[in-house]
């Protein structure tokens, strides 16, 4: 028998197997017909005492012979077809039953591979990665990874003592996907892929499609079952599917989950203390409900190794970061927010990725996800790598990732980070550091096609999910229809308004009249895109100071100007986003290492603090905004806005209307600390003008310069308008008047 068994030994392949260099383990492991009357069963079990084959339905076991001294076993079993069987493995007097990992059929079929190669498999995350399942009555985990240029790939983990020779994976062509079902591996088990590169090097890589990962600084992937969470947000999803975000009120609260609030944990520094997703859900939800926000936008929650990157250097695109708990915990967070009518937008980073050894960089020994040429593949500013958007599989990886967060975790929006860096080949680069496109230009044609494709994919589902671009240049048609050559986003961050306004507001009020045009500039291009006004985290870090810290003047001036700022922002066309802490005048610049300065809201000498009154104003303003359709229904239509006064630079005052079918609002903004007892405002029609919001009201911490009585217009021309009203114009304030037309009686001839 020994001599006969030896006739079937493929020694070169067996040696490659034992060195972890075998890409076709199915040729030397598992069962196959040796001849018409014998089945050859082989297995690799290093460092065990004996192995036998137990055939299903048979009482007899067939002891396997160790063909060499490295743990390669074989046996010839009489039979005309391959039976069902298991291995009986003995070590130190203990026997255990082990199903054969190489007896299972492939789960990657030709259609899967064709779609992936063509970049159109938007559920590829259901195939690649780690998926606990039961196959033929055997519980285990199915692993699959894309590594076309690797010589061999093994899945390693605690379940096989991290040995690369124990579970070599089977390569499936033409896609270059390695797969293997490993019996006995389940939820919570650690794993990585051991990749034998064409250079002869061996590296351990985290799974690009892993659903969970170890808490940093550890880097292993974790097997997780995403099918067990039971969602309860059906009503929210049904409403969202009918939602027209262009015509709805959108108030976004931008949040860094790990620094909103932090628990006190004995023996840990504050920077290492985090609430879990489940713990954070009611805390954040209650606050957003109290404040009147419609959505939260989470700075990246995808797995990342470095806290100081704030999540913008991602290594685990399919894994909610373990800093705050498990994938089920994150699902609970989103579900909880939805059940309380708050949407969840995710920051997403398709522009670049870090060079960490366990991540995507040179994944299979080649530049698989990135460009080979560093002029195309590296971001000099960030020290990161740029995706190769010209490779179908890379586009598929990213597109499927966005769809994964939408489908698997029910998120309501995707905010794409650093879009400008994707659009321009020379972004952040000097001459000689970039490669022109086929036409000699600096436009990244492949990135453009990718952005159009991903927006198309998201919007074709008609689920009501928003896409938002952080795009800092004047690239045309960011929110234009893909069919018309646009990129297809729902909204673009209005960086122009933000930069102009922040420069203006940091100017001493005495000199603001010289920069008056900065207040009105944004309306010159307002209708070129569908905009979202933002005061984001980027503006309160890196020495820029908090919103409170930017503003000149004393404490009261700062708080008054913040009320004015947020009121002007609410009245200006465009959806809104504000970074956490700025709504109550956080004094210190933001840091991811500590929670917000909530103590600023505590009473001072038994009285409400100015910061608490500012918070109350923002809460009132948010509710006010949602109650007045004129402030949001026609954000993208010129008919929804009208200037009344743009030239009063000497007083640093602007006046405008916001309009919709059912209401007209008049807004005044005074950007100096000067109070005007009788300020004349030209109005376009005769009517009654009732003040319904004044940021200088005493209850908000102001001086109380309000207009308690309705103002009746007079037939007196002012600012080119046929009628006018006279109001108290409060210092550093925004005031909103409800306008009601009154029929003018004609004089008898």
Write out the residue ranges for each language-model feature.
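Substrate-binding/active-site clefts of carbohydrate-active enzymes
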Residues: 214, 234-247, 256-443
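Conserved alpha/beta catalytic core and glycan-binding cleft of carbohydrate-active enzymes
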Residues: 410-412, 430-594, 626-696, 703-704
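Short acidic/polar active-site loop segments enriched in Thr and Asp
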Residues: 49, 151, 294-296, 412, ...
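Carbohydrate-interacting/catalytic domains
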Residues: 1-249, 278-288, 556-559, 570-578, ...
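Short, flexible loop/turn elements at secondary-structure junctions
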Residues: 68, 147-149, 173, 184, ...
């Amino acid at each position: 028998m020994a001599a006969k068994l030896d006739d079937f030994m493929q020694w070169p392949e067996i040696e490659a197997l034992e060195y972890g260099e075998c890409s076709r383990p199915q040729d030397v492991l598992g069962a196959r017909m040796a001849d018409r009357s014998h089945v050859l069963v082989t297995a690799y079990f290093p460092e065990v005492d004996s192995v036998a084959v137990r055939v299903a339905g048979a009482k007899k076991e067939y002891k396997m012979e160790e063909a060499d001294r490295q743990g390669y076993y074989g046996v010839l079993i009489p039979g005309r077809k391959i039976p069902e069987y298991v291995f009986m493995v003995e070590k130190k007097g203990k026997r255990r039953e082990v199903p054969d990992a190489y007896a299972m059929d492939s789960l990657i079929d030709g259609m899967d591979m064709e779609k992936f190669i063509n970049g159109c498999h938007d559920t590829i995350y259901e195939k690649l990665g780690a998926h606990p399942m039961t196959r033929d009555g055997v519980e285990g985990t199915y692993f699959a990874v894309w590594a076309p240029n690797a010589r061999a790939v093994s899945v390693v983990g605690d379940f096989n003592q991290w040995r690369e020779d124990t579970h070599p994976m089977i390569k499936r062509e033409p896609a270059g996907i390695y797969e293997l079902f490993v019996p006995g591996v389940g939820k919570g088990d650690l794993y990585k892929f051991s990749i034998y590169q064409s250079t002869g090097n061996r590296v351990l890589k985290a799974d690009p499609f892993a659903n969970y990962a170890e808490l940093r600084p550890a880097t292993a992937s974790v097997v997780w079952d995403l099918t067990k969470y039971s969602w309860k947000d059906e009503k929210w999803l049904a409403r969202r599917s009918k939602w027209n975000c262009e015509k709805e009120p959108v108030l976004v609260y931008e949040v860094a989950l790990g620094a909103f609030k932090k628990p006190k944990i004995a023996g840990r520094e504050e920077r290492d203390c985090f609430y879990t997703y489940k713990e954070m859900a009611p805390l954040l939800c209650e606050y957003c409900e109290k404040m009147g926000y419609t959505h939260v936008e989470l700075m990246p929650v995808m797995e990342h190794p470095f806290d100081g990157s704030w999540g913008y250097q991602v290594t685990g695109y399919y894994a909610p970061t373990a800093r705050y708990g498990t994938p089920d915990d994150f699902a609970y967070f989103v579900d909880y927010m939805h059940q309380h009518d708050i949407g969840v937008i995710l920051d997403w980073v398709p522009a670049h990725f870090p060079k960490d050894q366990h991540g995507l960089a040179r994944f299979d020994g080649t530049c698989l996800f990135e460009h080979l040429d560093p002029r195309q593949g590296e971001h000099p500013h960030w020290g990161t790598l740029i995706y190769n958007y010209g490779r179908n599989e890379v586009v598929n990886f990213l597109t499927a990732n966005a769809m994964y967060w939408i489908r698997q975790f029910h998120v309501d929006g995707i905010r794409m980070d650093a879009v400008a860096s994707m659009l321009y080949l020379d972004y952040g680069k000097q001459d000689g550091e970039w490669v022109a496109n086929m036409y000699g230009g600096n436009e990244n044609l492949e990135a453009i096609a990718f952005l159009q494709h991903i927006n198309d994919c998201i919007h074709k589902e008609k689920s009501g999910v928003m896409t938002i671009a952080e795009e800092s240049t004047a690239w045309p048609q960011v929110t234009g229809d893909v069919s018309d050559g646009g990129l297809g986003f729902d909204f673009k961050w209005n960086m122009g308004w933000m930069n102009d306004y922040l420069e203006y507001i940091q100017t001493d009020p005495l000199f603001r009249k010289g920069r008056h045009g900065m207040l009105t500039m944004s309306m010159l291009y307002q209708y070129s895109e569908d905009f979202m006004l933002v005061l984001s985290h980027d503006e309160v870090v890196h020495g820029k100071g908090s919103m409170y810290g930017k503003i000149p003047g004393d404490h009261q001036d700062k708080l008054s100007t913040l009320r004015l700022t947020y009121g002007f922002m609410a009245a200006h066309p465009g959806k809104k986003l504000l970074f956490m802490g700025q709504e109550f005048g956080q004094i210190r610049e933001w840091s991811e290492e500590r929670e917000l300065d909530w103590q600023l809201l505590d009473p001072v000498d038994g009285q409400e603090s100015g910061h608490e009154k500012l918070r109350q104003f923002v809460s009132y303003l948010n509710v006010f905004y949602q109650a007045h359709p004129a402030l949001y229904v026609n954000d993208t239509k010129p008919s929804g806005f009208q200037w009344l006064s743009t030239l009063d630079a000497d007083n640093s005052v602007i006046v405008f209307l916001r309009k919709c079918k059912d209401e007209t609002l008049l807004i005044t903004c005074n950007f100096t600390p000067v109070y005007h007892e009788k300020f004349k405002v030209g109005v376009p029609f005769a009517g009654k003008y009732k003040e319904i919001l004044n940021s200088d009201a005493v209850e908000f911490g102001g001086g109380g310069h309000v207009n308690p009585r309705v103002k009746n217009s007079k037939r007196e021309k002012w600012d080119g308008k046929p009628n006018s009203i006279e109001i108290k114009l409060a210092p550093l304030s925004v005031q909103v008047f409800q306008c009601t037309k009154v029929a003018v009686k004609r004089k008898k001839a």
